[in-house]
Amino acid sequence: MTEAALVEGQVKLRDGKKWKSRWLVLRKPSPVADCLLMLVYKDKCERSKGLRERSSLTLEDICGLEPALPYEGLAHTLAIICLSQAVMLGFDSHEAMCAWDTRIRYALGEVHRFHVTVAPGTKLESGPATLHLCNDILVLARDIPPTVMGQWKLSDLRRYGAVPNGFIFEGGTRCGYWAGVFFLSSAEGEQMSFLFDCIVRGISPTKGPFGLRPVLPDPSSGGPSASEERVAQEALEALQLEKRLSLLSHSGRPGSGGDDRSLSSSSSEASHSDISASSRLTAWPEQSSSSAGTSQEGPGLVAAQGPGEAMLGASRPPLKPLRPRQLQEVGRQSSSDSGIATGSHSSYSGSFSSYAGSNLDVWRAGEEFGSLLSLPPGASAPEPRLCACPPGAAEYQVPTSLRHHYDTPRSLRQAPRDPSPASQGSSDHGSATDLGGQAPTGCPSSWLGARRRGQATEGPGSDAALPSPSPGESWEAGSPHAGPPPAFFLSCSICGGLKVKPPP
């Protein structure tokens, strides 16, 4: 008995002249069986303990169900009609009877019944009867308990159909004794004809789509008290469910807020780390700290330089204070604001690469942000110095490869040049002002001096040699030629300063 029970519960069985209450279990021997196995226990305890049933009965050739037959003092009964017998089950309530009826009908398949009246003139006794249709079996039954008075198989019928005020069918020679034409008076002739058509064609009109099982009633409920208890239980479950949902909603709100706070804290930590990283990578000058920085760096640089270098530094004009980068004009935030530090560093590198391929006219724009000239000199790297030796002390230079020629803007060609070394300081200041009206912000003095030395060596009409950046700064890619920049300066073997390389 491995199959699950179709239905089980407390019922009343007829034993002689008395009704006895028993625990009844109905199950199928196999999923495809067309019979039912009825197991009878004394009470539910025997069933739960796994004891052997008191009696068992196999119901074969089931042809119909008849509920609500008043029998032997019970109004709520259910008759399971077979070809050879009928089993009467009694219940304490109408709900329990209907629940058993529904579950058994669902387990058997297509089970229908119609109240008809048999017309005279046939082999059947005329009078009221009940037509039962169970799958492909058709029977007529009467009396209480019901007894079968005629039986047919749908496949053995020659013809059938609805007629005015009734239903007619004809049994063929395969029906044996029940062959012939039979007329049943009923108002449900059309419905009977429809069911016959569906069952003959293998269609189940009362079954839903495959895999979907309807909600079957609970057979254990009985009486008004049981119904009230069931309603109270459902209300209690609804209240418990509502309470759980409210607790979940209240407990979920702090969690979500905590997640938001954790996310915001993590983002703030990330922004602080970005600020610290950018402060190590970039050094944007400030208006207030520029003068202090130059005054603090002055003594250290003078002590590290030689006597000649000190003299050259004394003759060099002082640097103009660096102006702060006005990032607000281009829609950016200040570098001290959180969240823009890493972006400022990336914008610096991006603007530096954007100037590649442009000519030297960009040096005129003193307000350009991110250009190479606007970057401050490195604090740790010393500023390159020029050679202080007299011009006649130059030694023999080793010839190198051909000199690269570059196009020079007219602004540099038309700049006034003063070859006399006595007026070098004044010419330095004049050439710096002629390049853009004023010295570019943050332009190192060595760049200006190197550019003047390069202009003094070139002749009129010849191409100007562009100065090379200092070792602490990057080369500005402003020439059309790719590759490393040419060497325009040589290191002096006497003082170690830079001097312009003469043409070969």
Swiss-Prot record:
UniProt subcellular location: Cell membrane; Synapse
PROSITE patterns: IRS_PTB, PH_DOMAIN
Domain IRS-type PTB: 105-210
Gene3D superfamilies: Pleckstrin-homology domain (PH domain)/Phosphotyrosine-binding domain (PTB)
CDD domains: PH_DOK7, PTB_DOK7
InterPro entries, alphabetized: Dok-7, Dok-7_PH, Dok-7_PTB, IRS_PTB, PH-like_dom_sf, PH_domain
Annotated stretches, region: Disordered: 210-232, 248-348, 371-483
Ranges of Low complexity composition bias in the record: 263-280
Pfam families given in the database record: IRS
Membrane topology per record: Peripheral membrane protein
GO molecular function, one term: protein kinase binding
Coarse class of the protein's main subcellular location: membrane
Ranges where the PH domain occurs: 4-109
Keyword Magnesium assigned: no
Residue ranges with Polar residues bias: 285-297, 331-341, 421-430
The protein's name: Protein Dok-7
Encoding gene, per UniProt annotation: Dok7
